[in-house]
Amino acid sequence: AVWALPGDSILLIDLGNGRMVSLGPDLEFGPTGPLSTGDPRSGLTIAIPQAVDGNGDVYVRSMGGGMGAARPDSGAVLRVTRGTLSVDTVAMFKLPEVTVTESGSANDRNVSMSVIPLSPQDAWGVAPDGSIVLARSGDYHVEWIAPDGSIVSGSPVRVESVSIGIDEKREWARSQAETGGGISIQVMMDNGALTTSFGRGGGGANAEDEELDQYTWPDVKPPFYGTRIIVDPQDRAWVRRHVDAGQPTLYDVFDRQGERVATYELPFRSRVVSFGASGVYVASLDDFDLNYLHRYTMPM
């Protein structure tokens, strides 16, 4: 992943080496840092950016808990200030449900967590001014948390439930292959030494139905995707809705009061990836799983 930083610099995420590094406009590498901090036994912070604000401060998610501890149902949005590297908790959000597998002895323990596909979770994003926007999965409403801590909550949005059948399961598996399958994290203890590794996980486009049935599935899809909420230049938050398998992509758009002001439809297998001064950048896939980047005029 690549993130824009002030001064025409970018932030590169290197999962293979478990580090992040900045790259300047002169193509010289800058400071590096680990993707995980803390002790897995008491609480691990995975410092993989989900957003960067206009000051270049990085926002990551903390899942809390630790080896041998019950996993909490909420995570924290952490702001890492560039320069000082100070960390502040700026919001809390609901985590997706997981299955946990543990093996080994006290000094040789292996803990693996797998997210339950399509389980409800909150989504969040960050505006350029550092405001946090969250979509709450309980009743599907959007709230904004300003840099001073004040909160504005919008009205709940009513949507029709989408049942999960075999087509929805197949589409989920295919989407994991399209986007790299998300990030898998493995923590291991070998003779008292702790190691953390990262990789791309998830199902594949050719997963058999029998493989899909091995997962734990909810009865219905949640109202929206738990992926990053993107804020456009008009300070509107774009939340991607869940739909029936094979249907066009839908985005609900919310203003700074948390009220839905528009719903936009994109072609099937398309998703918003970024915004420019007056355009929307959309990634799409064709029948051969080739990626294309499109620029649309910004809807008003």
Predicted regions and their residues:
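Eukaryotic scaffold repeat domains enriched in small/polar residues
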Residues: A1-M300
